[in-house]
From Swiss-Prot:
InterPro entries: GAGE (IPR031320), GAGE_fam (IPR008625). This is G antigen 5. Residues 32-45, 87-96 have a biased composition (Acidic residues). Belongs to the GAGE family. Expressed in a variety of tumor tissues but not in normal tissues, except testis. Residues 1-117 are annotated as: Disordered. The gene is GAGE5. This gene belongs to a family of genes organized in clustered repeats. They have a high degree of predicted sequence identity, but differ by scattered single nucleotide substitution. Their sequences contain either the antigenic peptide YYWPRPRRY or YRPRPRRY which is recognized by cytotoxic T-cells. Residues 103-117 have a biased composition (Basic and acidic residues). It comes from the Eukaryota. It comes from Homo sapiens.
Length: 117
């Protein structure tokens, strides 16, 4: 039996122990005062501009979708996949259609064009 060389598996090295933040000491908030404190609104600024923009959009979306009703799922799937001009599709699983048998495939005549998928 021949020698195979050095093993490629190395034992994991022991991890260094790092003291948790509680042991090191508390953080001083005065160091980070600019990041922690939110900006106060000015007196002339109206409070309506400070609303959450996501909440405002939800209200608009609810009003727009209430008149239209639920959309079919097929529409949302078609929007996700743009048409490439080729109408050949396999099927939902992509495995339903077998590749054509070369003996049964008809060769296109000179005047016809065959779509290539």
């Amino acid at each position: 039996m021949s020698w195979r060389g050095r093993s490629t598996y190395y034992w994991p090295r022991p991890r260094r122990y790092v003291q948790p933040p509680e042991v090191i000491g508390p953080m001083r908030p005065e160091q980070f005062s600019d990041e922690v404190e939110p900006a106060t609104p000015e007196e002339g600024e109206p409070a309506t501009q400070r609303q959450d923009p996501a909440a405002a959009q939800e209200g608009e979306d609810e009003g727009a979708s209430a008149g239209q009703g639920p959309k079919p799922e097929a529409d949302s799937q078609e929007q996700g996949h743009p048409q490439t001009g080729c109408e050949c599709e396999d099927g939902p699983d992509g495995q339903e259609m077998d590749p054509p048998n070369p003996e049964e495939v008809k060769t296109p005549e000179e005047g016809e064009k065959q779509s290539q998928c």
